[in-house]
Design a protein with these regions (language model features):
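Aromatic-lined carbohydrate-binding/catalytic grooves of carbohydrate-active enzymes
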Residues: 63-99
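Aromatic- and acidic-residue-enriched segments that line the glycan-binding/catalytic groove
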Residues: 76-91, 126-151, 188-211, 257-267
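Recognizes extended acidic, P/S/T-rich segments that occur
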Residues: 430-454
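Catalytic domains of carbohydrate-active enzymes, especially glycoside hydrolases
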Residues: 49-76, 178-182, 280, 284-289, ...
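Active-site neighborhood of glycoside hydrolase catalytic domains
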Residues: 163-294, 299-323
C-alpha cells in the first residue's frame, strides 16, 4: 500500500513572502551516499541522529526527494536475505547493525515525515569496490565467482549473463515488494569507466553467446538494454506507482559527422564508453525519470554545462528530466555573467529556462548540508523558499484523486487544526498520497502560486 494520510492535522502558520516565480512543481532531490564511508562503523543511535540532522537541513532548504544508497557492492543497507549487510554501514561485510536497525525503513519513515520522497538507490553491476578485501560467505563473489569479471581493483557482474541480470532484478523486486519507497534508482555504473589501457575481459562471454552480433560494442549495448528493460518491468509489475529512474553520465554522445545530433562536447560518452543508450531507453518508455550527471561548469572546454543542459532539455522528451548538480564543483566556478559569484544561480536559472527540464538533484547531499559558499542558504532563501510538488508523470496509470470529504476546522489553544477524510478510490493508483493546504486572503488568488502554499 502506498503511504497515504486519512486524517492530517496541520497548525496554520504565517506565510513569509518570497519569490513568486518559483514553480509549483519541481523535482528537488539529493543523493545520500554510503560509498564515501560516512556511515561506516558509527553506532546506530549516533547515525540515526546524523541522518535526521541531514534530512532536517535538506528539507529546510526546500528539497522534496532523497535518493538513498542501499546497495554499494552487491551488499545491503537494509534487511536482506539475498545479500549481506554492507561494510559501508557496519565496517564488516555481513555484520548487522546494532539495535536490529533497518536504515532503509528508517529513511522512508523520516523522509515521509518531512513530506519528502524516498528513492532506493542501487549500484547494479559493481560487485566490489577498490578497498574491499573481505567478503561475507553469502556474497556473490563467494557464491558465483564465475559470473564476476575483475577489472583492476574492481570486480563487476558480467552484464551479458542472464543469471546476473536476474539476480539484480531479484534484488529490485525484494526492495519494491517489502518497502514503501517512492522511487527505485540506479546510477551510471553499467560497464566500467575505463582505466588507462586496462581491458574489461568479457571475450569468453562474447564468443559463447554473441546473440547474432559481430560488433562487441553493439553486443554490450544490447546487454545493458536487456537489463534496463527487465528491471523497469520488474518494478512496474509489483508496484506501478513506484518511479523508476536512472542517473547516467552527463554526456550521451558527442556531435560528430556520424552522429550530428550529439552535444557540442568532446568528452567521454555514455554510448561508446559505458555502453548505455539512454535515448533508446527513453524512446522505449523504460524510464520514468532521467537525471544526467552534468557535473561540469559552464565554460568547461570539453563538457560545457550550459551546452549540456540545453541538449538534455531538447533531446530527453517523453521522460521527466532533472539535472544532476555537483555542489563542490559549482562553488569553485565563476558565474560568466557575474564574476563575483560562483555558478550556482547561473545553473539553477538555466534549469528553469529550458522547457524540457523539471528540476535538479544535488551531489552529494552532505555538501548541501555543509553549505559551502552559502550554497544551502541560496536554495533556502532564493530558489526553494516555497514548497514544490513533484512533477506530474502523465504517462503513469491512474486517475486524479477525488475531493476530500468531511473537511472541518477546529479551534485549539495552538490555533486552527484541519480534519478531513481521504477521497474514495477504487484502485491503488487512484489514491491520494499527499495533501496540499493553501491559504488565500482573496479567492481571486490562484492556488497555482507557491506563495499560497502552506
Amino acid at each position: 500500500m502506498r503511504k497515504h494520510l486519512i486524517v492530517l492535522l496541520l497548525t496554520l502558520f504565517t506565510v513569509v513572502p518570497c519569490n513568486a516565480s518559483q514553480p509549483k512543481r519541481e523535482f528537488r532531490g539529493a543523493w545520500i551516499q554510503a560509498v564515501n564511508h560516512q556511515f561506516e562503523g558509527i553506532p546506530t543511535a549516533k547515525l540515526k541522529a546524523e541522518l535526521s540532522r541531514q534530512l532536517d537541513s535538506l528539507a529546510g532548504c526546500g528539497l522534496n526527494a532523497i535518493l538513498f544508497q542501499v546497495r554499494v557492492e552487491a551488499d545491503a543497507l537494509y534487511k536482506s536475505d539475498l545479500e549481506p549487510w554492507s561494510a559501508y554501514l557496519t565496517g564488516l561485510q555481513g555484520q548487522a547493525p546494532d539495535e536490529d536497525w533497518d536504515p532503509l525503513q528508517f529513511m522512508i519513515e523520516e523522509c515521509h515525515r518531512r513530506c519528502m520522497e524516498l528513492h532506493a538507490w542501487i549500484n547494479p553491476f559493481r560487485a566490489k569496490t577498490k578497498t574491499t578485501t573481505e567478503f561475507a560467505p553469502n556474497h556473490q563473489i563467494k557464491l558465483h565467482p564465475e559470473r564476476i569479471i575483475n577489472y583492476g581493483e574492481l570486480a563487476l557482474f558480467d552484464p551479458s549473463l542472464q543469471e546476473n541480470r536476474d539476480h539484480i532484478c531479484k534484488i529490485a523486486a525484494d526492495i519494491v515488494t517489502r518497502y514503501d519507497i517512492d522511487g527505485f534508482h540506479i546510477d551510471d555504473y553499467f560497464y566500467p569507466y575505463p582505466e588507462g589501457n586496462l581491458k574489461f575481459n568479457d571475450d569468453a562471454s562474447f564468443r559463447k553467446d554473441p546473440k547474432g552480433f559481430n560488433n562487441k560494442d553493439d553486443w554490450r549495448r544490447d546487454n545493458v538494454n536487456l537489463f534496463v528493460e527487465q528491471i523497469y518491468h520488474t518494478v512496474k509489475e509489483i508496484k506501478p506507482w513506484v518511479k523508476f529512474g536512472i542517473s547516467p553520465f552527463g554526456i550521451y554522445r558527442n556531435k560528430t559527422v556520424d552522429y550530428p545530433s550529439g552535444s557540442e562536447t568532446t568528452g567521454f560518452e555514455n554510448w561508446s564508453g559505458l555502453y548505455a543508450d539512454i535515448l533508446y531507453w527513453i524512446e522505449k518508455g523504460w524510464m520514468d525519470y532521467c537525471i544526467p550527471q552534468v557535473y561540469w561548469n559552464t565554460g568547461h572546454q570539453s563538457a560545457d554545462y550550459a551546452v549540456l543542459a540545453k541538449w538534455w532539455s531538447d533531446n530527453a522528451g517523453g521522460c521527466l528530466t532533472y539535472l544532476g548538480q555537483d555542489v563542490e564543483r559549482t562553488v569553485t566556478g565563476v558565474d560568466p555573467n557575474h564574476p563575483e559569484s560562483n555558478q550556482q544561480r547561473h545553473k539553477l536559472n538555466l534549469e528553469r529556462i529550458f522547457p524540457g527540464l523539471q528540476g535538479n538533484c544535488f551531489w552529494p547531499a552532505k555538501a548541501v548540508v555543509d553549505n559551502p559558499d552559502d550554497y544551502r542558504t541560496v536554495l533556502a532563501k532564493e530558489y526553494y523558499s516555497t514548497p514544490a510538488l513533484q512533477p506530474v508523470a502523465d504517462y503513469l496509470p491512474g486517475n486524479t484523486p477525488g475531493k476530500v470529504r468531511k473537511l472541518m476546522s477546529v479551534e485549539t489553544i495552538d490555533g486552527p487544526v484541519l480534519f478531513w477524510t481521504a477521497p474514495k478510490a477504487r484502485k491503488e493508483m487512484d489514491k491520494a498520497i499527499q495533501y496540499v493546504i493553501y491559504r488565500l486572503k482573496r479567492m481571486r488568488k490562484s492556488i497555482s502560486m507557491t506563495l499560497n502554499t502552506l
